[in-house]
UniProtKB/Swiss-Prot annotation:
One of its GO terms (biological process) is protein modification process. It comes from Bifidobacterium animalis subsp. lactis (strain AD011). HAMAP family: NrdI. Disulfide bonds: none annotated. One of its GO terms (molecular function) is FMN binding. Pfam families: Flavodoxin_NdrI (PF07972). This is Protein NrdI. The lineage of its organism: Bacteria, Bacillati, Actinomycetota, Actinomycetes, Bifidobacteriales.
Amino acid sequence: MSAVVYFSSASRNTERFVEHCDFPSCGVNVFRIPLQPNAAPLNVREPYIIIVPTYGGGDARKAVPPQVKRFLNDPANREWIRGVIASGNTNFGEAYAAAGPIISRKCHVPLMYRFELMGTREDVHAVREGVRRFFSDTPTD
């Protein structure tokens, strides 16, 4: 099994991007990290790639959404992460998609791709095919 885990704010930019990728059609499960802090926590027990937006308005110290931090602070969830894909806003210069490299470093996984806001058609294609190839070429245990 393989999965994509994503977080999307109320803007739904990341959610729409993930929907356009149509991961289930290539055999990849999709799980959303809850937006509301009082929601039941998400527990993932299969290899996954995480897709995250960047927060903080250019402040890299606030780049990773708190909900994502909480999810990854669970050792059982962190055990299954295999890569990270980040979105961001190029208006923030050096902090563009900064959540990706932060998670990549802390979890010792590759930063696989970055895209702006909701992504383009080309981004959707690249991510969908990249995720499909990654899980078909990489042992999942």
